[in-house]
């Protein structure tokens, strides 16, 4: 098991980041890879959780220990796997998640991808009163305007990797057309829109 990996961020994709340390590049699946956009070729510390399956050894990465703690709580719920837990964390509304669990708000919880009514009920049953979280906001980064909105395309690709359907993403993309922001901010805004 690894608690964290400290090294140079060398690559960002829609599903994962690569952190190189001691000549080894570790693939870390993270909730929002583009949150690391401004840190390419810089030293980063990513908190990790390793999942060993019959067909794969996977590392999941988190920006903070709090994010990792939420992930571990979520995957302890029957019916929630690592991919779904990452999608929930990607919304970046920890207070809203806690509030929904404490208030038994099934409607809010079922807005997450792959969370149905039964899984939402199980989340409430297993997690009610278990954790208190506070929102942690990252720095806002602006990008230079361009004719092609690559950041929006990257954001939509990352959202699809989190399990959102193309039909949902088409509406979101249309809403953001003509705007200019970072992929990270597009993802945060889109996730908040989908949770309404």
UniProtKB/Swiss-Prot annotation:
<dbReference type="InterPro" id="IPR012340">
    <property type="entry name" value="NA-bd_OB-fold"/>
</dbReference>
<dbReference type="InterPro" id="IPR013849">
    <property type="entry name" value="DNA_helicase_Holl-junc_RuvA_I"/>
</dbReference>
<comment type="similarity">
    <text>Belongs to the RuvA family.</text>
</comment>
<keyword id="KW-0238">DNA-binding</keyword>
<dbReference type="GO" id="GO:0000400">
    <property type="term" value="F:four-way junction DNA binding"/>
</dbReference>
<dbReference type="InterPro" id="IPR011114">
    <property type="entry name" value="RuvA_C"/>
</dbReference>
<comment type="function">
    <text>The RuvA-RuvB-RuvC complex processes Holliday junction (HJ) DNA during genetic recombination and DNA repair, while the RuvA-RuvB complex plays an important role in the rescue of blocked DNA replication forks via replication fork reversal (RFR). RuvA specifically binds to HJ cruciform DNA, conferring on it an open structure. The RuvB hexamer acts as an ATP-dependent pump, pulling dsDNA into and through the RuvAB complex. HJ branch migration allows RuvC to scan DNA until it finds its consensus sequence, where it cleaves and resolves the cruciform DNA.</text>
</comment>
<dbReference type="GO" id="GO:0009378">
    <property type="term" value="F:four-way junction helicase activity"/>
</dbReference>
<dbReference type="InterPro" id="IPR003583">
    <property type="entry name" value="Hlx-hairpin-Hlx_DNA-bd_motif"/>
</dbReference>
<keyword id="KW-0233">DNA recombination</keyword>
<feature type="region of interest" description="Domain II">
    <location>
        <begin position="64"/>
        <end position="142"/>
    </location>
</feature>
<keyword id="KW-0963">Cytoplasm</keyword>
<dbReference type="GO" id="GO:0048476">
    <property type="term" value="C:Holliday junction resolvase complex"/>
</dbReference>
<feature type="region of interest" description="Flexible linker">
    <location>
        <begin position="142"/>
        <end position="146"/>
    </location>
</feature>
<dbReference type="Pfam" id="PF01330">
    <property type="entry name" value="RuvA_N"/>
</dbReference>
<dbReference type="GO" id="GO:0006281">
    <property type="term" value="P:DNA repair"/>
</dbReference>
<dbReference type="InterPro" id="IPR010994">
    <property type="entry name" value="RuvA_2-like"/>
</dbReference>
<comment type="subunit">
    <text>Homotetramer. Forms an RuvA(8)-RuvB(12)-Holliday junction (HJ) complex. HJ DNA is sandwiched between 2 RuvA tetramers; dsDNA enters through RuvA and exits via RuvB. An RuvB hexamer assembles on each DNA strand where it exits the tetramer. Each RuvB hexamer is contacted by two RuvA subunits (via domain III) on 2 adjacent RuvB subunits; this complex drives branch migration. In the full resolvosome a probable DNA-RuvA(4)-RuvB(12)-RuvC(2) complex forms which resolves the HJ.</text>
</comment>
<dbReference type="GO" id="GO:0005524">
    <property type="term" value="F:ATP binding"/>
</dbReference>
<dbReference type="InterPro" id="IPR036267">
    <property type="entry name" value="RuvA_C_sf"/>
</dbReference>
<dbReference type="GO" id="GO:0005737">
    <property type="term" value="C:cytoplasm"/>
</dbReference>
<keyword id="KW-0227">DNA damage</keyword>
<dbReference type="Pfam" id="PF07499">
    <property type="entry name" value="RuvA_C"/>
</dbReference>
<dbReference type="Pfam" id="PF14520">
    <property type="entry name" value="HHH_5"/>
</dbReference>
<protein>
    <recommendedName>
        <fullName>Holliday junction branch migration complex subunit RuvA</fullName>
    </recommendedName>
</protein>
<dbReference type="InterPro" id="IPR000085">
    <property type="entry name" value="RuvA"/>
</dbReference>
<feature type="region of interest" description="Domain III">
    <location>
        <begin position="147"/>
        <end position="196"/>
    </location>
</feature>
<dbReference type="GO" id="GO:0009379">
    <property type="term" value="C:Holliday junction helicase complex"/>
</dbReference>
<dbReference type="GO" id="GO:0006310">
    <property type="term" value="P:DNA recombination"/>
</dbReference>
<feature type="region of interest" description="Domain I">
    <location>
        <begin position="1"/>
        <end position="63"/>
    </location>
</feature>
<keyword id="KW-0234">DNA repair</keyword>
